[in-house]
Structures are given as C-alpha cells and as structure tokens.
C-alpha cells in the first residue's frame, strides 16, 4: 500500500489536446478515446537526428453515440498506428431505443411485485443505466409506482458515479451538457440510493418494496451482485437484465444461455426469474472505429492488438 500511495503522489493530470514535452525529442498529446470517462488515445512524437516520427496508440476505442460521454476523437495523421481491434471483425448492428425498452421491463417487473436486477460494470455502464432511468422518471414512463427505488450497490460504482458527477463539463457530450445547462444532473434523480457498507447492501433484500438493483460485477462472477441473484433468481416475479458482454465460463453467460439451475455460495438456486439481455451495449467500437484509424493520412504501419 505504501508503494501504491507513493506512486499516486507522483501522478500528474494533463488535459486533452495539450502537447507536452517529456524530455528532449519526446512529446505527447492525449485525445478523448470515448471509451470511459477520462480515457485517452496517445499521440507520441519522437525526434532523433533531426527526424521526427509520430506514433499513435489508440487505447480502447469507444463506441459512438454512447450516453453521457463524447464520441472518440480521431487524429489526422500518424506514421505508425497501434490500435485495439476487439470488435474489428463485426458490427454492433442498429441500436434499439433503450429508454422505452427499459421502461417496459421496469413496468412489467414492478407490476409483478418483483425486483429488476441489473448486473453492470461499475465504471461507465452503471452510469449509462442511471442516465436512462433518469429520463424514464422525468418522462413518467413507468406508472403506478411513484418514485420507485433504484439502488446502486457497489462501492466502486458509487465512487465512479461521484467522479462522473464532479467532472461534468470536461467530458460530457452535448446532450448531457444541455441537461446541465438546465440545472439537471443527468445521472441523479429522486429514489436513487447509493449503497456503500455491507449492512446497507444486506438491507436491500429485506425491503419488500419492488425496486431496481444495479450491482457489480457485470458478468456475475464476483461482487455483491451474487447476493442479489441468490435472492431473486428463484422468484418468478423478478427480472435479471444483462447490459454487457458475458464471457464464456461466467455465471452471466450461463444465465443468458438458459441455465435452469446455478450454484451460488455452495447452494443450488433454481432460475425462475425472467432473463433478458440488451443487444449492442458495448463501450468498444465495432469495425467502424478501427477502420477510421486505418484511414489516417501518411501512415506507414498499422498494428492491430
């Protein structure tokens, strides 16, 4: 821990688009990668014997039209490009309108007297879901349940949500900025409850009020989400909504694959809840993103990772 704290004290933030000299012959500049809040692609200029070459490292390239954050920026040129290609061989396809779809799922679940459990990545995806739910509440798309409670039950997700709240002007897209200009926080709303302690987490499942629970981990292999699944998978009234990729071998993959029974905390739990997956939700660009990088002017070499 002492070593980690020592490293943190040496960190220095650099704004996007500011060209910085690290030492003789080495300069860098960060561009908004549009993947997560604060994610960056790196432009690197190397000069030796009077010759300068520019190297571009993409980092994770964000998906376009994500809520809250800006789309990725693409530089005009580079001599060498090192880029990710997570979904370089496929397209995400047309995106559904998530807000009415989510409102419908919430309405049906709460009407049954159940809970909507959303396994979610703590950084990025959780805040997207809050963005959608704020709009649902603002537009009164769920009827008969007042300001139904929404729990974010993940210490990391709570910390990330606080960071989103504190860095609005720098990183929010035009839609989120327009809400801020009206005095509206894009991810906060009546009925939102942030759970940090284990006692607060345990209390959620002893409250019989139908509710929405957003918790990590997104693939259900660790974290508090496992407790919420144990309390809700056996209930026909409840719904589990997956909003991200589920890797092979994970509990989340087993559930979207139709598992009728799963093991949680050494106990077999019957799967009676409604299992739903939102298509196309990804923080990574599909093939359109990497292709945009290959169109840079004057590139000599492109390396896919």
Q: What is each model feature region?
A:
Residues 223-229, 282-296:
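A short, acidic, amphipathic alpha-helical segment used as a generic capping/interface helix at domain edges
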Residues 226-271:
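C-terminal, non-catalytic macromolecule-binding modules
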Residues 1-128, 134-143:
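His/Asp/Glu-rich metal-coordinating catalytic cores
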Residues 264-290:
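Generic long, charged, amphipathic alpha-helical segments
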Residues 74-76, 232-236, 296-297:
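Short, conserved loop/helix-junction motifs that constitute active-site signature segments
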Residues 12, 29, 56, 79-82, ...:
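Hydrophobic/aromatic beta-strand patches that form the interior of the parallel beta-sheet core
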Residues 105-114, 120-243:
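Hard-cation-handling environments
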């Amino acid at each position: 821990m002492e070593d980690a704290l020592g490293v943190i004290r040496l960190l220095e933030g650099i704004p996007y688009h500011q060209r910085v000299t690290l030492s003789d012959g080495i300069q860098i500049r960060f561009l908004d990668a549009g993947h997560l809040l604060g994610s960056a692609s790196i432009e690197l200029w190397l000069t030796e014997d009077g010759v300068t070459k520019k190297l571009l490292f993409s980092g994770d390239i964000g998906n376009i039209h994500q809520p809250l954050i800006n789309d990725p920026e693409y530089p005009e040129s580079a001599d060498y490009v090192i880029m990710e290609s997570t979904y370089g061989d496929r397209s995400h396809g047309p995106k559904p309108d998530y807000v009415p779809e989510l409102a419908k799922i919430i309405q049906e679940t709460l009407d049954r007297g159940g809970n909507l459990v959303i396994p979610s990545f703590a950084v990025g995806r959780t805040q997207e879901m809050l963005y959608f739910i704020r709009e649902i509440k603002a537009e009164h798309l769920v009827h008969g349940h007042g300001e139904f409670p929404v729990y974010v039950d993940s210490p990391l997700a709570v910390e990330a949500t606080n960071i989103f709240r504190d860095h609005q002007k720098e990183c929010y897209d035009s839609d989120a900025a327009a809400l801020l200009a009206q005095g509206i926080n894009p991810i906060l709303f009546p009925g939102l409850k942030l759970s940090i302690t284990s006692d607060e987490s345990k209390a959620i499942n002893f409250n019989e009020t139908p509710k929405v629970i957003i918790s990590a981990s997104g693939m259900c292999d660790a974290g508090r989400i496992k407790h919420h699944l144990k309390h809700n998978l056996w209930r026909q009234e409840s719904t589990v909504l997956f909003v991200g990729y589920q890797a092979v071998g994970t509990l989340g993959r087993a559930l979207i694959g139709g598992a009728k029974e799963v093991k949680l905390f050494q106990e077999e739990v019957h799967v009676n809840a409604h299992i739903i997956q939102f298509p196309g939700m990804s923080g990574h660009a599909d093939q359109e993103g990497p292709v945009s990088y290959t169109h840079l002017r004057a590139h000599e070499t492109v390396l896919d990772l």
